[in-house]
Amino acid sequence: MNKKIRVRYAPSPTGLLHIGNARTALFNYLFARHHGGDFIIRIEDTDRERHVEDGERSQLENLRWLGMDWDESPETHENYRQSERLPLYQKYIDQLLAEGKAYYSYKTPEELEADHAKQEAAGIPPHYINEYAGMSDDEKAAYIAERKAQNIEPVVRISVDEKAIYKWNDIVKGEIEFEGGNIGGDWVIQKRDGYPTYNFAVVVDDHDMQISHVIRGDDHIANTPKQLVVYNALGWEAPQFGHMTLIINSETGKKLSKRDTNTLQFIEDYRKKGYMSDAIFNFIALLGWNPGGEKEIFSCEELIELFDENRLSKSPAAFDQKKLDWMDNEYIKNADFAKVFELTKPFLVAANRFDERAKELVKLYQPQMKSADEIVELTELFYGDFPELTDEAREMLAAETTPLVLSTFRAKLAELPESDFTVENIFPLFKATQKETGVKGKMLWMPIRIAASGSMHGPELPETIALLGKEKVLAHLDAALNK
């Protein structure tokens, strides 16, 4: 690539950072960093009706949390918000008007709706019908004067050559082309309130900021021919376009929807639940791209080095919540304890469980956690009531050898002084119980685990027993023996 790589992520401050938008930002970031280019943040805030207070700060904060940095943004550069660039848009709108490539349109929303209703009834795709078609200059002047007298504010439309072919070689999908007659006719580049439309402003911005590549979701494919109309009208070279496939829900097979309740879809949600940012970064990077091979855990540096835009998938990317939870567990298991402890601290404090056992409990459950907030549920045994046993657990306790195992193990535990109730002293008692009862393996460990903790699965049993404390464990064993 000879041209300087410059890519952008251009969110609208209309809400929280969604997984799909985070992927767009991440792929642009990896592409820029891999090629030694620039990653730019631009805020597209011309949709004033949907503008959310603090939306911009939220977007940037969540991108930072994920581990991304950028070279240019509204924080460091002037006029990187579309609302600050209105004079620039007006300059090019005036140019197109002066060159006869755009014009004022006075059709009202009601008239446009009526046109579309007729087209729909006739089975014709909706498109704008030029209101000046067939008018003489005098008729056109009279029409405009009449509309002005009615205080109808015009929009500005750009002229579309319906016979032209708008095509590009897409980085992901290969060659794509649209006929000019299939993009809806002359379209609005400036709204009645004076603000530019998205498809016009984005072209001016990308040209002005010397964007070399536009990498975005394939829901933007239909926007691309409209943007090429503007590039052609202004005599500018278009950037290279790449349209990533959509993200689907792995359980439904349908496009990921904000209404899907089986997935968390906003980065803020993952932060609140105590997921590790590196895990989310890793997971999102593999949604629609893969370096090949079986490896799935990658550092940011590895992803930058391996990223290859030619390996972007042409098939939809499946968002699998269980896979993400598995990946976060891998990161938590292998993270420094101090980092994991800090991650769990707010949840322990909120649950009133940040006591002298907190560090040992986090250490105990670190290998099991899929997110830091799970520490509260995992430690319920130490602070709440004894859990309700499953049918399978009850069957295990009903085994013929269980009473002998539990009573023998209980007797040996009871002999340990409180001061010696440690993992080092508890561990040998299992071997001693096996030797005395002749019971071994699952039939030895499982009844003790169920009786002591109420669960068939969990962290290391000697550590669990030591942290529960002598009094509580003996009480649990007595309860199991007396059933």
UniProtKB/Swiss-Prot annotation:
* Cellular location(s): Cytoplasm
Its top-level enzyme class, in one word, is ligase
Q: Might you give the EC number(s) for this enzyme?
A: 6.1.1.17
Where ATP is bound, by residue? K258
Please name the CDD domains in this protein's record: GluRS_core
Q: Which reaction does it catalyse?
A: tRNA(Glu) + L-glutamate + ATP = L-glutamyl-tRNA(Glu) + AMP + diphosphate
What is a single cellular component term in the Gene Ontology annotation? Answer: cytosol
Q: Which Pfam families match?
A: Anticodon_2 (PF19269), tRNA-synt_1c (PF00749)
One Gene Ontology term of the molecular function aspect: glutamate-tRNA ligase activity
Motif extent ('KMSKS' region): 255-259
Summarizing the function annotation, the protein's role is: Catalyzes the attachment of glutamate to tRNA(Glu) in a two-step reaction: glutamate is first activated by ATP to form Glu-AMP and then transferred to the acceptor end of tRNA(Glu).
Q: Which HAMAP family does UniProt cross-reference here?
A: Glu_tRNA_synth_type1 (MF_00022)
State the family it belongs to: Belongs to the class-I aminoacyl-tRNA synthetase family. Glutamate--tRNA ligase type 1 subfamily.
What protein name applies here? Answer: Glutamate--tRNA ligase
Q: Which organism is it from?
A: Lactococcus lactis subsp. cremoris (strain MG1363)
Starting at the broadest rank, the lineage of the source organism is:
Bacteria, Bacillati, Bacillota, Bacilli, Lactobacillales
